[in-house]
């Protein structure tokens, strides 16, 4: 099922509707607290990288997953991509299958087991930062600076799966840039205030094969 994102989520400041919905963020807050206290398992047989987001919506994580896969492959690493199976994410799974070596299962633990069985060296997960059972070796958060964190509130009051302060527990940020250099600086400054040690990488996207269309 595809859910259309509410317009008020991406307003720079919370409006009346987002404030009214604040009490409904409590279950997500409790869930996030529990995840932080649960014991997670780190695999000793394979290196795991998770590329995900805390903003619900397009942040460029799948294109970045493909790019990182190809870079590691070119460097000679035996790498594979993992994607938890969701029936409504067929398009993403098809893109990944066409561009990478892909493992899909209904559980991320099964994906790890299959990658180990196939004697892979590195496993890149597309999505899964909020996974309860796995401790990844490297956790990367993707953002689009056009929307950034929207109104800054959690779902359903805003677009965030976790509070922005959760950047403290992540290793790197990949920021899809806009043409506004001042906006890029402001977001970078905000990220560094939360986690001075986090690595920040900047990306941009260029359309290819436009000659295929009769424009």
Give each language-model segment a name.
Residues 36-88, 180, 212:
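Walker A (P-loop) phosphate-binding motif
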Residues 1-17, 40, 73-78, 117-119, ...:
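Short, Lys/Arg-enriched, disordered terminal segments
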Residues 2-48:
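A transmembrane-helix-recognition feature enriched in membrane-embedded lipid enzymes
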Residues 52, 83, 143, 177, ...:
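Short beta-strand/turn micro-motifs composed of small residues
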Residues 87-195:
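Phosphate/Mg2+-binding loops and adjacent switch elements
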């Amino acid at each position: 099922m595809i859910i259309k994102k509410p317009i008020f989520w991406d307003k720079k400041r919370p409006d009346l509707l987002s404030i009214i919905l604040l009490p409904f963020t409590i279950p997500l807050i409790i869930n996030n607290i529990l995840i932080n206290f649960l014991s997670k398992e780190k695999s000793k047989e394979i290196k795991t990288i998770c590329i995900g987001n805390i903003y619900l919506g397009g942040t460029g994580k799948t294109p970045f997953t493909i790019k990182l896969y190809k870079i590691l492959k070119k460097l000679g690493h035996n790498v594979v991509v993992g994607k938890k199976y969701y029936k409504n994410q067929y398009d993403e799974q098809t893109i990944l299958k066409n561009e990478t070596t892909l493992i899909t299962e209904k559980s991320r633990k099964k994906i790890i087991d299959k990658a180990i069985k196939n004697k892979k060296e590195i496993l890149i997960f597309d999505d899964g930062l909020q996974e309860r059972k796995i401790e990844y070796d490297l956790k990367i958060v993707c953002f689009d600076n056009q929307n950034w964190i929207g109104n800054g509130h959690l779902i359903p009051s805003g677009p965030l799966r976790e509070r922005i302060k959760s950047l403290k527990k992540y290793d790197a940020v990949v920021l899809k840039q806009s043409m506004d250099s001042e906006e890029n600086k402001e977001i970078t400054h905000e990220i560094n205030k939360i986690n001075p040690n986090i690595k920040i990488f900047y990306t941009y996207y260029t359309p290819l094969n436009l000659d295929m269309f009769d424009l």
